[in-house]
Amino acid sequence: MERKKAKIVAELQAVKHNSGKSYNQLAEETGLTNVYVAQLLRRQAQLNPQTAPLLRAALPDLPQDLVPEMMRPPLRSYDPNLIQDPTVYRLNEAVMHFGESIKEIINEEFGDGTMSAIDFYCSVDKIKGVDGKDRVVLTFDGKYLPHSEQKSEHMVSRTRPLGKQ
């Protein structure tokens, strides 16, 4: 399975490279975020049937036989060696360093809960800092999910026998 995914990803990356387009250009042409386009081309996200024609228009050399493959639920995995890449390592370091404070602010602003990584949008943007140097802006836009008190009376599997829904 991983081997097949690696082959498909290599093909998708070649199509993107040969197009000469950036993820930002593809995002603009498809109406998706730049990170989501990258996720699609790495088989980390599922291509929506309504989006397929937009992606095909943005990447005319995308082989037709890859489109149905991109519409299948992907195996969302990653190479464990990826952490050795300096950018990925620094992202992990930033989340670990600021994570506890971010969690505390989420709890303070919203209550006991978390940010969804399923109902989630992500983008990477470039801006100039006050010193005139380039800066990276990462936006994580996730739905707030409150934790719930686990009352037995609300546990459907206990109130209705399994198979008799």
UniProtKB/Swiss-Prot annotation:
Key word Lyase present: yes
Matching InterPro entries: Cyanase (IPR008076), Cyanate_lyase_C (IPR003712), Cyanate_lyase_C_sf (IPR036581), Lambda_DNA-bd_dom_sf (IPR010982)
Annotated GO MF terms: cyanate hydratase activity; DNA binding
Active-site residues, Swiss-Prot/TrEMBL: 90, 93, 116
Recorded catalytic activity of this chain's protein: cyanate + hydrogencarbonate + 3 H(+) = NH4(+) + 2 CO2
Key words, A-Z: Lyase
Pfam families: Cyanate_lyase
EC number: 4.2.1.104
CDD domains xrefs: Cyanase_C (cd00559)
UniProt-listed GO biological process terms: cyanate metabolic process
PANTHER family cross-referenced by the UniProt entry: CYANATE HYDRATASE
The family this protein is said to belong to: Belongs to the cyanase family.
Function per UniProt: Catalyzes the reaction of cyanate with bicarbonate to produce ammonia and carbon dioxide.
Designated name of the protein: Cyanate hydratase
